[in-house]
Amino acid sequence: MFRRNIITSAILLMAPLAFSAQSLAESLTVEQRLELLEKALRETQSELKKYKDEEKKKYTPATVNRSVSTNDQGYAANPFPTSRAAKPDAVLVKNEEKNASETGSIYSSMTLKDFSKFVKDEIGFSYNGYYRSGWGTASHGSPKSWAIGSLGRFGNEYSGWFDLQLKQRVYNENGKRVDAIVMMDGNVGQQYSTGWFGDNAGGENFMQFSDMYVTTKGFLPFAPEADFWVGKHGAPKIEIQMLDWKTQRTDAAAGVGLENWKVGPGKIDIALVREDVDDYDRSLQNKQQINTNTIDLRYKDIPLWDKATLMVSGRYVSANESASEKDNQDNNGYYDWKETWMFGTSLTQKFDKGGFNEFSFLVANNSIASNFGRYAGASPFTTFNGRYYGDHTGGTAVRLTSQGEAYIGDHFIVANAIVYSFGNDIYSYETGAHSDFESIRAVVRPAYIWDQYNQTGVELGYFTQQNKDANSNKYNESGYKTTLFHTFKVNTSMLTSRPEIRFYATYIKALENELDGFTFEDNKDDQFAVGAQAEIWW
């Protein structure tokens, strides 16, 4: 054995002078290779034991005397009952540095949370999303949603909307970063068991790529901290969450923009995007594509006082029409395109005990003003369900909104969404050109907080709207909703914490329906529904 070791040592010492590393590996016998591996393993185990002993000395609590208790039969009770294995607080990570630390250890400790974050940052990939899904039944057959944008969402939505975002960092060096982002959104039907996209008579199942763009940091010398993006992407959306529509929304086929550009006390978001529309003729049977471009400019996060910020926004939409498109509008009965704009301001106040409230003021003209006049959903689109039509004559509309939530004591929370709007000489999709309208919608949601994971409450919604057409005929639409609910939650906030599972019972009634003629099943003007819904984002 001694002779074999001497020969082996001589071979190992002389090999670098005569052979490459590959040649050495090929010349060693299986026995020699195993001996080298065993030696390396012993050294590693010794180093690991040394580190564990050091950590044990640091964190092992002093021993205490325990009296041995006995059970009812007189036997000694187990002083160390078996328990489920706990998740370790830390993991061992081998240091990259060649020189060991002062203790001589080549390992260091890292918490699982930090280790998980490190791995995610190293990979540079994230998967984010949102969806809702649930079951419901009603007193008159299939449950129906009505006026979600005015009466509120709880117990009044039966869709399966989803958003799925994939983000991959592709470069992050020398103060410059590049990310690729793709987002898909759509709806999965909640009525039939089959969910094939595009193969459903009700049109429930659909999906689109709403975003596909590249965003960067550090490439613009004048705004190194800003997010500069190019591709299919729009300006950030701002939502009235309880009503499920947006106060700020600029959809895009493709564009270029800058977000979070630090200028003065606030930040600038600016986007130039393309958003073509289908321009219809007066029969609403024929259409032509019109190229439109939108500029969306916002100056946000302007500090006012403690926990209060201001945003000022503006949006302008213009068409780039061809000669043939203009000729169709002049001679073939197609609706004329009219430039449209929207501008306004919003103030956000955060509260010391948690919660917030956001107040906004917006004014718009032409087709955006027409969408201010919609009671069901009032996002500032330039079209109605993707179709551009109507005799727009420069009329304007104004909208005032309030939304937020506030804690009252330790066990109560109240969320609200209140909207007042009116317009003059607008095109209404219900009452035509030269219409005036006025509406108010209010939803409040008080709840009792049992603990971090349970709330019981009620959502109360009411709205009323009156339109007056060009002949001064008046049309009224109004209704109310009452929803009792209990929710399983992970935090106490109503508007900013998900996942959430809610159980509800809803009574909803249409008081007047002169704008849309809506009825529930069996031509009823009311509906009682019960159900359960899950909503999650991550």
From Swiss-Prot:
GO biological process: monoatomic ion transport; polysaccharide transport
Gene3D superfamilies listed in its UniProt record: Porin, LamB type
Subcellular location: Cell outer membrane
Membrane topology: Multi-pass membrane protein
Function of the molecule: May be a sugar porin with a broad carbohydrate specificity.
PANTHER family: CRYPTIC OUTER MEMBRANE PORIN BGLH-RELATED
This protein's name: Putative outer membrane porin BglH
Organism name: Escherichia coli O6:H1 (strain CFT073 / ATCC 700928 / UPEC)
